[in-house]
Amino acid sequence: MEDKRLLQMQVFRAVVEHDGFTAAAYALESSQPFVSRTIAQLERRLGAKLIHRNTRRHRLTEEGERYLATCREILGALDDAENTFAGNSMPAGDLRVSAPLAFGTDQVLPLLPTFLATRPSVKVHLSLRDAIVNLIEENVDVAVRMGRLHDSQLRARKLCDLQRVVVAAPSYIERHGAPPTPEALKEHNCLEWHGAQEHLNRWPFRIRGERHEHVAAGNFRSSNGLSLAGMCYRGVGVMRMAEHLALPAIRKGHLVRLLGEFEDHDDTAIHAVYLPERRLSTRVRMFIDYLADAFREPPWAASD
């Protein structure tokens, strides 16, 4: 009897990766009825619903999320084995990466040309946004995350420490002066995060040996880190900015560091997170190693 399990895994993965039955059929050079029939057979065989279907989108069930992790592990191992016996030890296939907008643009994107040049059979799909993505629902292999990690189901590798500093443009200071103490920030226009990153509006300081927090308040807020940084550069307000953006701008004279003697750093870091598969594919493992090596000595900490 023909064993169709591997084919069903491949079709299921294609539906998830291409976000739908029609797109999966196109990618597989097959038909939409074949894809639908294969998924129905798979669900009957497993005795579980894997995909919620409606007219607008498809969403994995909890069972579907677990099965996808298994499919990725098995199919990734198969790809690695085929490459090995073909005399090709280099990774191949799609690599889906997510990163915050500013950090991804400023730090991850410049690393990709060398990575791709030395691994020509890998195709990188890079998604940049400040929202926390669900790796399974968004079909992401590796996500770069800044700050504390909250999803204990994911595995993580620390890339480097993450610190933020309070800054303002020289033009802002010329008009409004520099706050001499954290308490004085109440009289200043502080740029605010909106949405999933609103916790960053609580700025920590150390005053007379005790930790205090200032809640940022001002006339501009955004869910986008690059837009906040852009308004800070243009003299709109004061911002608590990640060092990868702030330190180079300070050295160039575009920003001025404020309240340095009161800084109280959070115990936070930048991590590469990935699904808890027992065996990572070669391309995912190599990319995480590549990031870890690149950020072992953070490039923004070095003098220009």
Give a label for each model feature.
Residues A92-R155:
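Central regulatory/effector-binding core of bacterial HTH transcription factors
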Residues L42-E43, L255:
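Conserved amphipathic alpha-helical core elements
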